[in-house]
């Protein structure tokens, strides 16, 4: 079951859904149903498109080594996935233009433009000159940009509603910062695991432990005044520690199982929102 959860690109939408609801839980905010639905649909469309385009470009260049099982799955089932993705994209458009308030639409257009620019940069046949890229956000790598965009999409609904109700944005921003680092670690770990031999040393274990320790310390600081934000930071720390443990046992897992597990361990906030 977890195998197809990953192969059908349902993993990222699930993570987006869980964390958006968790951020809302941390701020005592109830999100309208259309918000998590929009996030899940949009994430699924983006990931399906990303994997289909990756497969198409690699097959055209006869670069089969960079293709993983998820890419082959999407290529084999493209006649089903493409119409479904188009339908999901249309549903997203309907939600945005009929249910989303105009001020929120204006704010989110900035995030959408940034995501579109990144997506175009990654999949454009004519890449931007390297000197342009080095002069613009030279610190950011692909994994960090993905983590920041993903986090922004998940936290903005709760952050805007919490701020509108007079809540301080600091606790939720702190939790979002930890989640952004966790999302980066997830992407970085996947990249390292897929490009290293199982016997090669990986930095993921130590990086995950450092992030887990930082998260635990932040959770302790937040507990007295913001117990829910502290609990969410603690959940992120547990996820980080689980990524470290996956790094230790990666030689015993198949690449597909390892890739699916890397996203599965991000669902720790379920323990908070379902209790």
PLM segments and residue spans:
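Interhelical loop and helix-boundary elements at the membrane-water interface
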Residues: 1-14, 55-85, 119-148, 195-210, ...
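Non-cleavable N-terminal signal-anchor transmembrane helices
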Residues: 1-45
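Alpha-helical transmembrane segments of integral membrane proteins
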Residues: 7-12, 34-38, 79-85, 106-110, ...
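Hydrophobic cores of alpha-helical transmembrane segments in multi-pass inner/ER membrane proteins
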Residues: 16-21, 114, 148-158, 181-187, ...
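Helix-coil boundary and interhelical linker segments in multi-pass alpha-helical membrane proteins
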Residues: 20-38, 93-107, 154-177, 219-230, ...
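Transmembrane alpha-helical segments that form the membrane-embedded catalytic/substrate-channel core
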Residues: 41-56, 113-126, 178-195, 239-248
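Transmembrane helix-loop-helix
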Residues: 79-128, 208-256
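Aromatic-anchored, glycine/proline-accented short structural segments
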Residues: 155-217
């Amino acid at each position: 079951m977890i195998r197809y959860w990953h192969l059908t690109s349902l993993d990222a939408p699930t993570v987006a859904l869980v964390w958006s609801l968790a951020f809302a839980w941390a701020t005592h905010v109830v999100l309208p149903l259309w918000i998590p639905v929009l996030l899940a649909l949009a994430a699924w469309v983006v990931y399906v498109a990303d994997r289909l385009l990756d497969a198409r470009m690699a097959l055209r260049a006869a670069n089969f080594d960079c293709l993983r099982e998820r890419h082959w799955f999407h290529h084999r089932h493209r006649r089903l996935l493409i119409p479904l993705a188009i339908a999901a994209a249309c549903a997203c458009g309907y939600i945005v233009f009929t249910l989303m308030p105009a001020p929120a639409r204006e704010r989110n257009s900035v995030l959408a433009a940034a995501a579109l620019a990144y997506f175009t940069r990654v999949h454009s046949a004519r890449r931007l000159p390297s000197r342009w890229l080095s002069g613009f956000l030279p610190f950011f790598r692909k994994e960090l940009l993905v983590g920041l965009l993903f986090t922004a999409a998940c936290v903005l609904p709760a952050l805007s509603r919490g701020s509108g109700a007079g809540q301080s944005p600091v606790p939720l921003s702190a939790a979002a910062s930890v989640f952004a680092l966790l999302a980066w670690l997830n992407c970085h770990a996947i990249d390292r695991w897929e490009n290293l031999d199982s016997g090669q040393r990986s930095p993921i274990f130590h990086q995950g432990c450092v992030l887990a320790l930082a998260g635990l310390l932040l959770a302790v600081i937040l507990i007295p005044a913001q117990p829910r934000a502290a609990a969410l930071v603690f959940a992120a720390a547990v996820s980080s520690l689980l990524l470290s443990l996956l790094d230790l046992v990666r030689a015993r897992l198949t690449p597909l199982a390892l890739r699916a597990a890397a996203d599965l361990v991000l669902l720790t906030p379920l323990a908070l929102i379902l209790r």
